[in-house]
Amino acid sequence: MIEVPEDNRSSQTKRKNTEKNCNELMVDEKMDDDSSPRDEMKDKLKGTKSLIIRKSELMAKKYDTWQLKAIFLFSAFICTFAYGLDSSIRGTYMTYAMNSYSAHSLISTVSVIVLMISAVSQVIFGGLSDIFGRLTLFLVSIVLYIVGTIIQSQAYDVQRYAAGAVFYYVGLVGVMLQVVLMLSDNSSLKWRLFYTLIPSWPSIITTWVSGSVVEAANPLENWSWNIAMWAFIFPLCCIPLILCMLHMRWKVRNDVEWKELQDEKSYYQTHGLVQMLVQLFWKLDVVGVLLFTAGVGCILVPLTLAGGVSTNWRNSKIIGPFVLGFVLVPGFIYWESRLALVPFAPFKLLKDRGVWAPLGIMFFICFVYQMAAGYLYTILVVAVDESASSATRIINLYSFVTAVVAPFLGLIVTRSSRLKSYIIFGGSLYFITMGLFYRYRSGQDADGGIIAGMVIWGLSSCLFDYPTIVSIQSVTSHENMATVTALNYTVFRIGGAVAAAISGAIWTQSLYPKLLHYMGDADLATAAYGSPLTFILSNPWGTPVRSAMVEAYRHVQKYEVIVALVFSAPMFLLTFCVRDPRLTEDFAQKLPDREYVQTKEDDPINDWIAKRFAKALGRS
């Protein structure tokens, strides 16, 4: 065999790539002639996106030994441990912060705001990560995380705390998304669930540590410093993962393929900053994102503000944003369907059940959680007489169960190669959990039932939540993986925002009247409503005032759980609509051009159900 010199091989490869690109361009132009200008508009940043994805695949191949993979997973574990512990106790600190502002009922208002902002930021982070790379967006997210943490820690009113929470949550969801994408980039479909479950593992530790941390930190007086210290703890915990990504880039630097990719120019290099910004404006659908955020936010936030000690539905500050929201939503629909060049939720991707079914499930997962557990910490402390540490542990117990089961489930899935059966079984467990939450809502004997509910919830989360994420990734290509993953988390947080609004509306509209009814004293009811965690210090368990407070909480929590139970039904029905492709050793599905979803795989469970129905109908 005659060996071709290295330079000649490189030039031949480049020539072949050039010919291939020319042929693909001719095919694209031919197809574009038969398509409408808007529907088949060429994504001018597609070349840059493809370049980043090809680089990530080459980098992933360099971590091909079990030692390097173990180091990478451990680095991801350290990062997720840091933000997992922080987020598990920061929710508790928010309760104490609102209590210090005498605005405890506004927890749901802050939750709606941050969930909506963080939801749409997922789409932006997903789009930008394919253009600028995972590591760059990871670093940007860390900066936002730090800025938000500092603002929150120094806030002395609800408005400033909410502003800090927006920066913090945008940074948090950015970090979470980039970690998931890094793990996905470095795993085959068969091992995807195992890698995706890595962020849940820290809960094995944080569930038990978080309660002790909260108790030792004395958040009633020191919540500000307790938040501030994470501005330097979290970045330090991210260093190992950053070093792993840099090490991958260093190992791949001498590869011929990598050098060829380095020679390729991005859209920014060929067209300049101005054209790049214009394309990003359309690519990220900035107008659509703003219309969606403003419209839905204006509808949801007033729901959490209209109630309380006195009703505010006649106040123009409540009615104005509420009406504006309903005006903006049709504007958003018109923009996305008629004017947006690149809709942030592409219809071609959403129209297949392999995508819309998992997205629907993710909406209901966060919706049900926020409805049933949005005020659970306060319920445990006030109505069940739990300490701060035990209440924190109980809230995080479901994460602990998920983390314990996760490694075993991940390994089992690598052998079974399908996910749908786990998703269906996990979805059915939600009914048991909500039933327990309905039965055990108050009283010192309720803690056992709530703990049992959280344990079952954790098991269902492991079998249901994470396989659903992998399911939507497994039906599309690597190029669309970031898009569907970002959409997944976006819809997830929108579900939480909607639930927080409904939960807050129920809480603010119902709690004060019930407190007034059971206590019979307006001053006592107002104090108990505004700062319950301070109020119970002077009204210990067993006193008539505390008993009246418990009855009021029990009554309101009943409606919260009923709504969660009702919406568990459509969530379960959607499990039968997800696709069930085989999980292979590939990074993602290999699809022909202009195909977004793998539709040719069989679906054993749906096929079996269809045969049973056909057989039953035949007999009748």
Swiss-Prot record:
Give the encoding gene's name: ARN2
Topology with respect to the bilayer: Multi-pass membrane protein
| Subcellular localization(s) per the UniProt record | Endosome membrane
Q: InterPro entries recorded for this chain? A: MFS, MFS_dom, MFS_trans_sf
Gene3D superfamilies (UniProt xref): MFS general substrate transporter like domains (1.20.1250.20)
Q: Does Transmembrane show up as a keyword for this record? A: yes
Source taxonomy: Eukaryota, Fungi, Dikarya, Ascomycota, Saccharomycotina
- What is the purpose of this protein? Involved in the transport of siderophore triacestylfusarinine C and so has a role in iron homeostasis.
Record-given protein name: Siderophore iron transporter ARN2
User: Is Mitochondrion among the key words of this record?
Assistant: no
Q: Which GO terms describe its biological process?
A: intracellular iron ion homeostasis; siderophore metabolic process; siderophore transport; transmembrane transport
Gene Ontology MF: a single term: siderophore-iron transmembrane transporter activity
